[in-house]
Amino acid sequence: MKRSKWRTRFAGAYCDPILRSWLTEPDSLTARCQRASSAFRVRLLRYGKGQALADEAVEGKAGRHSAWVREVVLECDGVPVIFAHTTLSTARRGRMTRWMAGLGSRSLGSLLFAYPGFKRGGIEFLRLDRCHPLYRRAAALGAGRKSLWARRSLHRLGGQQVLVTEVFLPAITLLK
């Protein structure tokens, strides 16, 4: 089995300190974005049935499998700062399936951190390059860098798991 490139420790020694603070934020990025801007918005890019990415494992399944896929961009004062990609296995139905379907342009983070039944796993980090599909999707939002930092974590509720990956766009460093 191929070893994951995602790491449980942040190894960005030469990372901008503001970016580092966002990457290692233990609480809700939605709440922090709301505090750091006067106008916060979640823009829904895509939601529907699709395939999990090769490096995503949800419900204990390695590699590509059928999943509900949701992609949004978090905007602060009209500027894209975070691209978020979420997968939920289609193998089981439950509260998460219904909630994800009904979110629309509302933040998933506000649900994950407000509902007491959620259990969050550890945060993993990866510097995405141009070969990674999430880099390409984030770059389409105007991120013209050779690489972008991302983090991901698994959230559990009952028998379901949702994998949330957040890709940090260059404008994030303009926020505190």
UniProtKB/Swiss-Prot annotation:
Binding site residues for substrate: R70, L108, E166
Major location category of this protein: cytoplasm
UniProt EC number: 4.1.3.40
Pathway(s) where this gene product acts: Cofactor biosynthesis; ubiquinone biosynthesis
MF GO annotations: chorismate lyase activity
Pfam families assigned to the protein according to its UniProt record, in alphabetical order: Chor_lyase (PF04345)
One Gene Ontology biological process: pyruvate biosynthetic process
Subcellular location: Cytoplasm
InterPro entries: Chorismate--pyruvate_lyase (IPR007440), Chorismate_lyase_/UTRA_dom_sf (IPR028978)
Catalysed reaction, written as an equation: chorismate = 4-hydroxybenzoate + pyruvate
Domain of life: Bacteria
A single GO cellular-component term on record: cytosol
The entry's keywords: Cytoplasm, Lyase, Pyruvate, Ubiquinone biosynthesis
SUPFAM superfamilies assigned: Chorismate lyase-like
Free-text function comment from the UniProt entry: Removes the pyruvyl group from chorismate, with concomitant aromatization of the ring, to provide 4-hydroxybenzoate (4HB) for the ubiquinone pathway.
Family: Belongs to the UbiC family.
Protein name: Probable chorismate pyruvate-lyase
Primary gene name: ubiC
